[in-house]
Amino acid sequence: MNFDKFIVIVTGLSGGGKTVTLRTLEDIGFFCVDNLPPPIVLEFLGMLNEYSSFKNIAIGIDIRVQQFLEKATELIKRIKDIYKIEVLFLEADDDTILLRYKETRRPHPLSTHYNDLHKAIKQERELLYPLRCLSDRIIDTSNLNPHELKFLIRSMYGAEKISPSITIISFGYKKGIPANADLIFDARFLPNPYFIPSLTDLNGKDKPVKDFVLKQNETIEFLTYIKNFLSFAVSGYKREGRAYVTIAIGCTGGRHRSVVLVEEIADYLRSLSLNPVVIHRDL
C-alpha cells in the first residue's frame, strides 16, 4: 500500500456542499480535481505518484458522471487496496437542497431527465446510495452554512488540527434524532418548562426558561455528568486523531430543555479552548 499519498474522494448529493468542500481542501494544500470519470482515476493517480510531489489529493465524483457510477464503487474498493484513502459523502435533507437550488437558480444535474426537482433529488439519492454505503464519513450539511462547513472541513483535514471539530445540536424527539449524531443525551426526564404557562411560548435562549431549567437539581447533576464525560472523551478523541464529533441533546420538542443544555455545554467546551458549532435544529 502507498502511504505517501492521502486521497479523499469527495462525493454526495448535488447541493450538499461538495463545491465548498473541494475549495476548502484546495485552500489547505490539497491537489483537487472535480468531476473526474472513474475509469481514469487510477491512471490519474499513477501519474501523480510518478510525476508530482503532492501528498494530499481530493477527487470529486458525483452524479454528473452517472454513466460511470456502477464502476465507481468497484474503483474505490480497488483504490483502497493501493492508497490511503477516505471517502467523504455530503448530503442534506430534501427541503434544504430545494431551498439551495431556489437560491442559486442553478439546474440540477438530472433536470434534463426530470422536470420535477423533487423527483430528481429522489433519483439522485438512489443512484448514489452504493457510494454512500462505501463512505468513511457522512456529513449532513442541512444545518450548516458555508462558513460552518469550511470550518468543519478545515478541522477534519487541516494540518493544524489538534482537537476534533465539535458540533453540538439541540433537537426534539418529536421530529426524530439527528442522523449524524455520534453522542446523544436524552433530557426528557428533566422538569419541563413547557407546562409552565408563562414559559410555554418562550425558548431555551430566554432567561426565564434558562433560570427554570438550571435551578433544577436534576439539571445540575446531568450537566456535571455530561461535562465530566466530554472532558474524558475529548482527550480520547485527540489521541485517536478523530476529526470531528457531533453531540446531540434532545428533549420532547427541542425548544426548551435541550436548548438550555446545549448553550451550557457549548460554554463549557469553549472553556476547554474548543470552538463548537452550535445548532438549534428545532427553534
Curated annotation (Swiss-Prot):
Superkingdom of origin organism: Bacteria
UniProt KW keywords: ATP-binding, GTP-binding, Nucleotide-binding
A Pfam family per the record: PapZ_C
Residues binding GTP: 62-65
This protein's record includes keyword Magnesium: no
Annotated disulfide bonds: none
Protein name from the UniProt record: Nucleotide-binding protein THEYE_A0235
Stored HAMAP family: RapZ_like
Keyword Nucleotide-binding belongs to the record: yes
Function of the protein: Displays ATPase and GTPase activities.
Binding residues annotated for ATP, in chain numbering: 12-19
MF term (GO), any: GTP binding
Family named by the database record: Belongs to the RapZ-like family.
InterPro entries registered for this protein in UniProt: P-loop_NTPase, RapZ-like, RapZ-like_N, RapZ_C
